[in-house]
Structures are given as C-alpha cells and as structure tokens.
Amino acid sequence: MGMRMMVTVFLLVVLATTVVSLRSNRASDGRRGIVNKLNDLVPKYWTECCGRIGPHCSRCICPEVACPKNG
C-alpha cells in the first residue's frame, strides 16, 4: 500500500508541474505577442533617426516639431 501511494503522489506532482509549465509558457507567448504588436506600431529606428540621418534611416521620421533640422 505504501508503494502505491508514493507512485500516486509522484504522478500528481509531475502532472501539476507540467500544467504550471504549460500555462506559464502560454502567458509569456501572449506577452510577447503584445510587445511585437507595439513594436509594429512604433517605427523601428525612431530614436536612432530622429533629428539626424542614422545608419538605417535615410530621412527624419519624427514630426517637424520634435525633429529640428541639423545644420
């Protein structure tokens, strides 16, 4: 009887650990999706290119007020 109880407890622990792991992975995927959507809404090189020409930017992509012409 003791061995059967230990096996049952072990299987319950494994099952609980698996469920918690799967749920946390799904939650992190959701957060990653939200972050990716936000990144798509904001121009990729906004800070690198604002007010000057950067390595990935051929023109200023900020509004005129926030992007004074340099020289």
Swiss-Prot record:
Post-translational modifications reported in the UniProt record: Contains 3 disulfide bonds. They are not indicated here, since framework IV presents two different connectivities (I-V, II-III, IV-VI and I-III, II-V, IV-VI).
Signal peptide coordinates: 1-21
Expression across tissues: Expressed by the venom duct.
Alphabetized UniProt keyword annotations: Amidation, Disulfide bond, Ion channel impairing toxin, Neurotoxin, Secreted, Signal, Toxin
Pfam family, one: Toxin_8
Modified positions (Asparagine amide) in chain numbering: 70
Propeptide: 22-44
Gene Ontology cellular component terms for the protein in this record: extracellular region
Location(s), subcellular: Secreted
Gene Ontology MF, one: toxin activity
Free-text note regarding domains: The cysteine framework is IV (CC-C-C-C-C).
Assigned protein family: Belongs to the conotoxin A superfamily.
Protein name, as recorded: Conotoxin Bu24
Species of the source: Conus bullatus (Bubble cone)
Native organism taxonomy: Eukaryota, Metazoa, Spiralia, Lophotrochozoa, Mollusca
